[in-house]
């Protein structure tokens, strides 16, 4: 029987003043799902605040770093690469700035039709950075 592998970990908090600290604890509990990188994005209702780095949750997020992630909403991610390499560009959550503001997203999985989706979006006028 083939060995099962974990695939990343995603955690979120909504409407809690301790969002960054609780997300840190959630990611720490999910650390077994990914040790390559970790990230947290918080929202204070106006701005997104982001910290991501390569390594373990406890090495990336000090009390000082967590204090710089204000807001009542947060998403966090720990990465285990099933595709793609272990590089900074593959860290999550992903933060996107666009004409309506900013958006943060974290996901666990692979888009098997990514090229056709991109082609379709570009045909409709989307611009990728």
Where would I find each of the regions flagged by the language model?
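Conserved glycine-bearing catalytic or ligand-binding loops at nucleotide- and phosphate-handling centers
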Residues: 121-129
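N-terminal glutamine amidotransferase
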Residues: 1-115, 120
